[in-house]
From Swiss-Prot:
Expressed in various tissues at low level. It comes from the Eukaryota. The modification Phosphoserine is found at residue 133. The lineage of its organism: Eukaryota, Metazoa, Chordata, Craniata, Vertebrata. Its EC number is 3.4.19.12. Keywords: Cytoplasm, Hydrolase, Phosphoprotein, Protease, Thiol protease, Ubl conjugation pathway. This is Ubiquitin carboxyl-terminal hydrolase isozyme L4. Residues 5-232 form the UCH catalytic domain. GO terms for biological process: ubiquitin-dependent protein catabolic process.
Protein backbone atom coordinates (compact mmCIF):
# COMPACT_ATOMS: atom_id res chain seq x y z
CA UNK A 1 0.00 0.00 0.00
CA UNK A 2 1.35 3.40 -0.97
CA UNK A 3 2.33 5.71 1.85
CA UNK A 4 1.47 9.34 2.31
CA UNK A 5 2.24 11.88 -0.41
CA UNK A 6 4.30 15.01 0.25
CA UNK A 7 5.01 17.82 -2.18
CA UNK A 8 8.54 17.63 -3.64
CA UNK A 9 11.05 20.29 -2.67
CA UNK A 10 13.02 22.17 -5.30
CA UNK A 11 16.65 21.24 -5.99
CA UNK A 12 17.80 24.62 -4.75
CA UNK A 13 20.38 25.12 -1.95
CA UNK A 14 18.58 28.27 -0.77
CA UNK A 15 15.34 26.32 -0.23
CA UNK A 16 17.22 23.41 1.31
CA UNK A 17 19.16 25.55 3.75
CA UNK A 18 16.05 27.45 4.80
CA UNK A 19 14.20 24.17 5.35
CA UNK A 20 17.00 22.82 7.55
CA UNK A 21 17.19 26.13 9.43
CA UNK A 22 13.47 25.87 10.22
CA UNK A 23 14.11 22.35 11.53
CA UNK A 24 16.72 23.74 13.92
CA UNK A 25 20.02 23.08 12.13
CA UNK A 26 22.72 25.66 12.90
CA UNK A 27 24.03 27.19 9.65
CA UNK A 28 27.67 26.22 10.24
CA UNK A 29 27.15 23.78 7.36
CA UNK A 30 25.30 24.83 4.19
CA UNK A 31 24.29 23.17 0.95
CA UNK A 32 25.90 24.64 -2.18
CA UNK A 33 25.50 23.89 -5.88
CA UNK A 34 27.90 21.52 -7.60
CA UNK A 35 28.15 23.25 -10.97
CA UNK A 36 30.05 20.48 -12.72
CA UNK A 37 32.22 17.41 -12.30
CA UNK A 38 35.45 19.01 -13.59
CA UNK A 39 38.25 19.67 -11.09
CA UNK A 40 38.21 23.45 -11.63
CA UNK A 41 34.49 23.59 -10.78
CA UNK A 42 34.95 21.32 -7.77
CA UNK A 43 37.73 23.59 -6.51
CA UNK A 44 35.29 26.45 -5.86
CA UNK A 45 33.21 24.36 -3.44
CA UNK A 46 34.02 25.26 0.20
CA UNK A 47 35.76 22.46 2.08
CA UNK A 48 35.36 20.27 3.94
CA UNK A 49 32.34 18.55 2.38
CA UNK A 50 30.49 16.02 4.55
CA UNK A 51 27.68 14.88 2.20
CA UNK A 52 26.41 15.20 -1.36
CA UNK A 53 22.85 14.81 -2.61
CA UNK A 54 22.56 13.58 -6.20
CA UNK A 55 19.43 14.19 -8.26
CA UNK A 56 18.89 11.80 -11.16
CA UNK A 57 16.07 10.55 -13.41
CA UNK A 58 14.39 7.21 -12.82
CA UNK A 59 14.69 5.56 -16.25
CA UNK A 60 14.36 2.02 -17.59
CA UNK A 61 18.16 1.76 -17.78
CA UNK A 62 18.47 2.77 -14.14
CA UNK A 63 15.79 0.31 -13.02
CA UNK A 64 17.58 -2.54 -14.82
CA UNK A 65 20.85 -1.58 -13.13
CA UNK A 66 19.19 -1.21 -9.72
CA UNK A 67 17.70 -4.71 -9.93
CA UNK A 68 21.01 -6.25 -11.03
CA UNK A 69 22.92 -4.40 -8.29
CA UNK A 70 20.50 -5.58 -5.60
CA UNK A 71 20.69 -9.21 -6.75
CA UNK A 72 24.50 -9.09 -6.87
CA UNK A 73 24.80 -7.68 -3.34
CA UNK A 74 22.29 -10.19 -1.98
CA UNK A 75 24.30 -13.06 -3.45
CA UNK A 76 27.82 -11.77 -2.73
CA UNK A 77 27.20 -9.67 0.38
CA UNK A 78 28.82 -6.38 1.41
CA UNK A 79 30.21 -4.77 4.54
CA UNK A 80 28.00 -2.07 6.09
CA UNK A 81 28.95 -0.52 9.41
CA UNK A 82 26.24 -0.41 12.07
CA UNK A 83 27.05 3.30 12.46
CA UNK A 84 25.16 4.14 9.25
CA UNK A 85 21.77 5.80 9.88
CA UNK A 86 19.49 4.49 7.13
CA UNK A 87 15.75 4.79 6.60
CA UNK A 88 13.34 3.47 4.02
CA UNK A 89 11.14 5.72 1.89
CA UNK A 90 7.40 5.19 2.12
CA UNK A 91 6.33 8.79 1.45
CA UNK A 92 5.67 9.39 -2.25
CA UNK A 93 7.47 12.40 -3.78
CA UNK A 94 9.63 12.76 -0.64
CA UNK A 95 12.74 12.35 -2.77
CA UNK A 96 11.32 13.92 -5.93
CA UNK A 97 13.28 17.00 -7.01
CA UNK A 98 14.91 17.01 -3.60
CA UNK A 99 13.99 14.84 -0.71
CA UNK A 100 13.51 15.26 2.98
CA UNK A 101 14.76 11.68 3.37
CA UNK A 102 17.98 12.53 1.55
CA UNK A 103 18.47 15.50 3.85
CA UNK A 104 17.83 13.37 6.92
CA UNK A 105 20.39 10.84 5.68
CA UNK A 106 22.94 13.62 5.14
CA UNK A 107 22.47 15.18 8.58
CA UNK A 108 21.97 11.98 10.59
CA UNK A 109 25.30 10.59 9.40
CA UNK A 110 27.15 13.79 10.29
CA UNK A 111 25.85 14.49 13.79
CA UNK A 112 29.47 14.75 14.98
CA UNK A 113 29.97 17.76 12.68
CA UNK A 114 26.69 19.69 12.50
CA UNK A 115 25.23 21.74 15.34
CA UNK A 116 21.58 21.98 16.32
CA UNK A 117 19.73 24.93 17.79
CA UNK A 118 17.96 24.52 21.12
CA UNK A 119 14.65 22.70 20.63
CA UNK A 120 15.56 21.49 17.13
CA UNK A 121 12.78 19.43 15.53
CA UNK A 122 15.30 17.49 13.44
CA UNK A 123 17.52 16.69 16.41
CA UNK A 124 14.47 15.44 18.32
CA UNK A 125 13.44 13.21 15.42
CA UNK A 126 16.94 11.74 15.09
CA UNK A 127 17.21 11.07 18.82
CA UNK A 128 13.80 9.43 18.94
CA UNK A 129 14.45 7.24 15.89
CA UNK A 130 18.08 6.25 16.54
CA UNK A 131 17.22 2.74 17.78
CA UNK A 132 14.49 2.10 15.20
CA UNK A 133 14.77 -0.10 12.12
CA UNK A 134 14.88 1.57 8.66
CA UNK A 135 11.21 0.62 8.17
CA UNK A 136 10.19 1.96 11.58
CA UNK A 137 11.96 5.27 10.88
CA UNK A 138 10.02 5.60 7.63
CA UNK A 139 6.70 5.04 9.36
CA UNK A 140 7.65 7.44 12.14
CA UNK A 141 8.46 10.18 9.62
CA UNK A 142 5.11 9.68 7.87
CA UNK A 143 3.32 10.78 11.02
CA UNK A 144 5.84 13.39 12.21
CA UNK A 145 3.74 16.52 11.70
CA UNK A 146 6.44 19.00 12.76
CA UNK A 147 8.64 17.94 9.83
CA UNK A 148 5.75 17.48 7.37
CA UNK A 149 4.37 21.00 7.93
CA UNK A 150 7.84 22.54 7.53
CA UNK A 151 8.37 20.47 4.39
CA UNK A 152 5.13 21.68 2.79
CA UNK A 153 5.93 25.30 3.63
CA UNK A 154 9.37 24.98 2.03
CA UNK A 155 7.92 23.25 -1.06
CA UNK A 156 6.07 26.48 -1.88
CA UNK A 157 9.14 28.71 -1.40
CA UNK A 158 11.12 27.57 -4.45
CA UNK A 159 11.77 29.58 -7.59
CA UNK A 160 9.50 27.29 -9.61
CA UNK A 161 5.86 26.53 -8.91
CA UNK A 162 5.36 23.45 -6.75
CA UNK A 163 3.67 20.61 -8.66
CA UNK A 164 0.41 19.03 -7.61
CA UNK A 165 0.74 16.63 -4.70
CA UNK A 166 -0.68 13.92 -7.03
CA UNK A 167 1.72 14.67 -9.90
CA UNK A 168 4.14 11.83 -10.61
CA UNK A 169 7.79 12.87 -10.19
CA UNK A 170 10.35 10.75 -12.05
CA UNK A 171 13.37 12.39 -10.42
CA UNK A 172 14.97 11.00 -7.30
CA UNK A 173 17.53 12.15 -4.74
CA UNK A 174 20.07 9.99 -2.91
CA UNK A 175 22.57 10.92 -0.23
CA UNK A 176 26.27 10.05 -0.45
CA UNK A 177 28.05 10.17 2.90
CA UNK A 178 31.26 9.15 4.65
CA UNK A 179 30.81 6.81 7.62
CA UNK A 180 33.66 4.95 9.34
CA UNK A 181 36.07 5.32 6.42
CA UNK A 182 33.67 4.23 3.67
CA UNK A 183 31.46 5.99 1.14
CA UNK A 184 27.81 4.99 1.38
CA UNK A 185 24.94 5.59 -1.01
CA UNK A 186 21.71 5.99 0.96
CA UNK A 187 18.54 5.53 -1.05
CA UNK A 188 15.29 4.85 0.79
CA UNK A 189 13.93 2.99 -2.23
CA UNK A 190 16.70 0.39 -1.91
CA UNK A 191 16.65 -2.36 0.72
CA UNK A 192 20.01 -1.40 2.21
CA UNK A 193 22.87 1.13 2.02
CA UNK A 194 25.37 0.65 -0.84
CA UNK A 195 29.05 0.59 0.13
CA UNK A 196 31.09 2.29 -2.62
CA UNK A 197 34.47 1.68 -1.03
CA UNK A 198 36.95 3.60 1.05
CA UNK A 199 36.91 7.38 1.46
CA UNK A 200 37.98 10.09 3.90
CA UNK A 201 36.91 13.57 4.96
CA UNK A 202 39.58 14.98 2.65
CA UNK A 203 38.68 12.95 -0.46
CA UNK A 204 34.92 12.58 -0.02
CA UNK A 205 33.88 15.04 -2.74
CA UNK A 206 36.19 13.55 -5.36
CA UNK A 207 35.12 10.01 -4.43
CA UNK A 208 31.45 11.00 -4.63
CA UNK A 209 31.98 12.52 -8.07
CA UNK A 210 33.28 9.16 -9.32
CA UNK A 211 29.99 7.57 -8.23
CA UNK A 212 27.97 10.41 -9.79
CA UNK A 213 29.78 9.96 -13.11
CA UNK A 214 28.76 6.28 -13.15
CA UNK A 215 25.11 7.32 -12.81
CA UNK A 216 25.54 9.69 -15.76
CA UNK A 217 27.40 7.13 -17.88
CA UNK A 218 24.54 4.65 -17.48
CA UNK A 219 22.14 7.19 -19.03
CA UNK A 220 24.27 9.17 -21.51
CA UNK A 221 21.24 10.67 -23.26
CA UNK A 222 19.85 12.13 -20.02
CA UNK A 223 20.61 15.68 -18.91
CA UNK A 224 18.53 15.75 -15.73
CA UNK A 225 21.34 15.33 -13.24
CA UNK A 226 22.11 17.75 -10.44
CA UNK A 227 24.09 17.68 -7.20
CA UNK A 228 24.37 19.80 -4.08
CA UNK A 229 27.09 19.47 -1.46
CA UNK A 230 26.87 20.01 2.29
CA UNK A 231 29.98 22.03 3.05
CA UNK A 232 31.42 24.06 5.89
CA UNK A 233 30.05 27.61 5.87
Amino acid sequence: MEGQRWLPLEANPEVTNQFLKQLGLHPNWQFVDVYGMESELLSIIPRPVCAVLLLFPITEKYEVFRTEEEEKIKSQGQDVTSSVYFMKQTISNACGTIGTIGLIHAIANNKDKVHFESGSTLKKFLEESVSMSPEERAKYLENYDAIRVTHETSAHEGQTEAPSIDEKVDLHFIALVHVDGHLYELDGWKPFPINHGKTSDETLLEDVIKVCKKFMERDPDELRFNAIALSAA
